[in-house]
Amino acid sequence: KHGEYKLVRLTKRIDDRLLPKVKIVDMRMELATRKKIAIFSTVLLDAIENTLKKGKQAIIFLNRRGFSTFISCKSCGLVLKCKRCDTVLVYHFEEKKLICHYCGYTQEPPEICPKCKSGYIKYLGLGTERVESEISRQFAQAHISRMDSDTTTKAGSHDSILGKFKSGETSILVGTQMIAKGLDFPEVTLVGVVSADVTLNIPDFRSSERTFNLLTQVAGRAGRGEHAGEVIVQTY
């Protein structure tokens, strides 16, 4: 009303480049077909394989770091939480520790349940560390990098990871929201979103808006060069 702000609409990409095609994969149907819980759908695995065969690059996005997002006793149901702030502890494979992402508290993972003394401890949930591990297993010949706040703590590590990806030394980049914005790599023709539901479950009344914004941003990393892009979004 006061003319202080103007609405600017971006109706197309620069140089009239095509927007990437977006495909939604219902992982519940995947579970029903394959009879097991899988990190990647057959659609995403096939897309990654085709991308690598063409000599192009892929970005795999999951906005959750760590290996297992919680560990639980299958006997009594106990979920291990931070002793300081009661936040669920996340297991990090490289450090071999449980870490609180809120206050930084760490502890060794228990061999038996501290409550019922059962040895039936399960590592559950999914983070970028596990995604990287699984992709390395599925595509052993591919060069893979992971970019999150765990891999970018050292000086120069951020530029090193992006430099290798830009040069083509790395063919698959796994990461959190750090890779969702501002990256322009013309050879990236595929973006895979492992679990689009992660940010929807955050206790914030704007979680749906933030999820849409994040998905829109990461989808924009695909097809920024001469070749058309594809985005595969896995959801439950």
Each predicted region: which residue ranges?
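Inter-lobe coupling/hinge segments of SF2-like helicase ATPases
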Residues: 1-236
